[in-house]
Structures are given as C-alpha cells and as structure tokens.
C-alpha cells in the first residue's frame, strides 16, 4: 500500500462521545482521534466525510470512501471488509425512574437509526413503537418526553447520563441476550482493499498492545472499553 496518499475516511457526525462537534465548534471524539492517529501511522492524509450511516455506507459502495469508523452499520454488509474490533460495547436502556418500561405495550423506544439495535429492539419488544434517529435527536426526544426509553450502546449512554441533562434519567435493569450484551466494533473497509485492511489491523494491534488505545480512550471514558 503506497504511503503519502490521501485516505478517505468516513465518520458519523452525530454520535458523542465517538464523533461529534463540541461547544466551540471543534471536531472531537474517540473515533475521530483514533482515525486521525491511524492515518498518521499509515503515512496517509485523512480526507474526512461526516454524515449519517446511510451516507457513509453509500460512500464505501461507490468507492468515494476507503474506510469508515461506523461499525454500527450492522448486520455486517456483504462484500465489505471488517477489521478486528477496536472496542467492545454493550446495549443498555435509559429511562426515567418509575416511567414506562420497554416491555409495556405502546412504549416508545428510541434507537440509533441503521444500527443492529433496531432489529433487536423490534424482536425484544414487538408491541413497542420503535423511533429511530441520531443520538442527539433521540436524547432530545427523551428529555422532552417524546420517547419513553433510549436503547443505545453504553459508551454513548453513560456519556449522556453523566451530563446535567442526564441526572433525571437512569439505566433500566433490562436483561439482554449474550450477543446484545457485548458487541465488538470494527472499521469497515471497502471491497477489494485487503491491503488496506491488513495495514489497519496491524496498526490497531500495535495501538492495543502498546496501551496507547487505552490511554487515548481515557480522554472520553472512565472504564476499559476493550
């Protein structure tokens, strides 16, 4: 794989603390930092694309993107290549204590659009109303009473609960199957780029075993994510 060339990288623009714009208008996030570090290690210049999962997936399909840090495009898409996991997350439900739970008929459950959790929510709670949107949109709906429960991965969930707005909410004690409890998150690489996949896996392994990945994650998380 030639060094010194541009690497077209896609990230979600609406998923704090993984990728988001802070109050000062600066791009931040664990995945953003990791992607920038990966480009540097590969000797490539990052060319960024931020958008919805649907937009990023189209970019991989049409060749305008080389890879995306959007493992929430599950189930895994046929023809794309996937790295080894760079973190593990678990699903959780967030709601108001004493409020309507997800197993109650007519419960409104918010789920990040395009994620594997949409399918699982429909399977777990067939009588519920599933509402999809960005993380920011769903959090606003939860705060305003537009949804009863937020079904989300715990990285984004705990980040919200630690904010002032999250103080009136809590994690709901809901049992899940083993696959939902722990999910490995991967970089998706466009079809045919086995050389790029091998390089990504090599650098992710170095970051993991050297402790650099853990040190970087401490900027956003207070617990081990791998």
What are these regions (language model features)?
Residues 4-13, 100-119, 130:
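Short loop->beta-strand "edge-of-pocket" segments that line small-molecule binding or catalytic clefts
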Residues 4-29:
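Short glycine-rich His-centered loop
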Residues 8, 62, 66-67, 148-149, ...:
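Short, Asp-centered acidic motifs that coordinate Mg2+ and/or phosphate
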Residues 13, 87-92, 162-205, 221-226:
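Periplasmic-binding protein-like
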Residues 15, 32-33, 47-58, 130-144:
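Short helix-initiation/N-cap motifs at beta->coil->alpha
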Residues 30, 34, 104-108, 192-206, ...:
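Short amphipathic alpha-helical coupling segments at ligand-binding clamshell hinges
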Residues 32, 36, 40, 45-105, ...:
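Acidic, polar ligand-binding/catalytic clefts
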Residues 120-137, 169-173, 204-226:
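Ligand-binding clefts/hinges and TM-proximal coupling segments of bilobed small-molecule sensing domains
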């Amino acid at each position: 794989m030639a060094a010194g060339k541009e690497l077209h990288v896609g990230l979600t623009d609406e998923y704090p603390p993984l990728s988001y714009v802070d109050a000062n208008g600066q791009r931040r996030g664990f995945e953003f930092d990791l992607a920038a570090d990966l480009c540097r290690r590969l000797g490539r210049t990052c060319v960024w694309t931020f958008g919805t999962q649907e937009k990023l997936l189209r970019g991989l399909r049409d060749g305008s993107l080389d890879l995306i840090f959007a493992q929430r495009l599950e189930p895994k898409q046929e023809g794309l290549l996937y790295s080894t996991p760079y973190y593990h997350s678990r699903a959780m439900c967030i709601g108001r204590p004493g409020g309507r739970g997800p197993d109650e008929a007519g419960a409104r459950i918010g789920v990040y659009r395009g994620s594997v959790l949409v399918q699982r929510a429909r399977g777990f709670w067939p009588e519920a109303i599933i509402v999809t949107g960005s993380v920011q949109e769903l959090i606003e709906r939860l705060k305003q009473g537009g949804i009863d429960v937020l079904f989300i991965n715990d990285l984004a969930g705990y980040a919200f609960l630690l904010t002032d707005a999250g103080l009136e909410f809590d994690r709901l004690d809901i049992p899940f199957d083993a696959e939902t409890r722990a999910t490995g998150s991967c970089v998706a690489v466009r079809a045919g780029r086995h050389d790029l996949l091998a390089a990504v896996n090599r650098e992710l392994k170095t970051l993991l075993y050297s402790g650099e990945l853990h040190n970087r994650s401490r900027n956003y998380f207070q617990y081990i994510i791998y």
